[in-house]
């Protein structure tokens, strides 16, 4: 389970409630779940006690950067009662050690594309580390909204031939299609993807980069938060340009 926010760690909206509750419900059904989020500054350290367990190299436009992977050492009561859920966080303070999750004083961080490209590649680096250590190998990577959508794109492109990800399927849940992760064309290179993907059949969207569009195109399965919303986003009123 990969989410940009999750209760009880960090929250700006309803996405966090879903991403926090769903792993627990899946665990009740007998699934072994790992939740991976960014290590934000707002996470209550005394309460959750995230501690370093390893480092992973994350490719970036400026060369590889080592991200710290932390695991929660004092799980919440709900997780303790359910079991079979572990929470991990990708830590890189220049990106995630800020006052807000996505913005400050009503203004989006201008490097959000770079921040969440880093997060997505950090997630995949962690999964590869799990596999190489024979610790854990997921069957499904469940992604939430535009901030995690690049995981699906990377797995079908840059990471398509890596044995660690053989058989891994992706599910992308759309919580609010109004937020698509759109950025100027000049930032596309920060994704590390080939220029051939910046086309109308790829991540290009009216001259801009659209991360949610990429996730929709490359994920193995799409879900929404309700049957009603799944129908609404197929209309111009709620599809925000992606209804076609």
Kindly give the residue locations of the regions a language model identified.
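Catalytic cores of nucleotide-sugar-dependent glycosyltransferases that transfer UDP/GDP/TDP-activated
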Residues: 1-244
């Amino acid at each position: 389970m990969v989410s940009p926010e999750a209760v009880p760690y960090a929250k700006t909206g309803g996405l966090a409630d879903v991403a926090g509750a769903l792993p627990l419900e899946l665990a009740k059904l007998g699934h072994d779940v790992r939740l991976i989020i960014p290590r934000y500054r707002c996470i209550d350290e005394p309460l959750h006690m995230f501690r370093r367990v390893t480092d992973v190299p994350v490719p970036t436009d400026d060369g590889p950067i080592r991200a710290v992977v932390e695991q929660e050492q004092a799980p919440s009561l709900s997780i303790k009662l359910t079991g079979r859920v572990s929470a991990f966080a990708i830590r890189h303070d220049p990106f995630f050690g800020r006052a807000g999750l996505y913005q400050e004083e009503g203004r989006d961080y201008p490097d959000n594309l770079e921040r969440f490209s880093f997060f997505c590649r950090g997630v995949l680096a962690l999964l590869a580390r799990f596999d190489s250590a024979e610790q854990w190998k997921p069957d499904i990577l469940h992604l939430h909204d535009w901030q995690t959508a690049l995981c699906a794109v990377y797995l079908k492109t840059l990471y398509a031939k890596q044995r660690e990800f053989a058989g891994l399927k992706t599910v992308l849940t759309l919580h609010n299609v109004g937020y698509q992760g759109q950025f100027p064309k000049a930032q596309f290179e920060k994704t590390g993807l080939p220029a051939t993907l910046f086309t109308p059949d790829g991540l290009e969207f009216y001259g801009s980069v659209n991360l949610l569009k990429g996730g929709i195109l490359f994920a193995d399965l799409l879900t929404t938060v309700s049957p009603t919303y799944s129908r609404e986003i197929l209309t111009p009123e709620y599809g925000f340009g992606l209804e076609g």
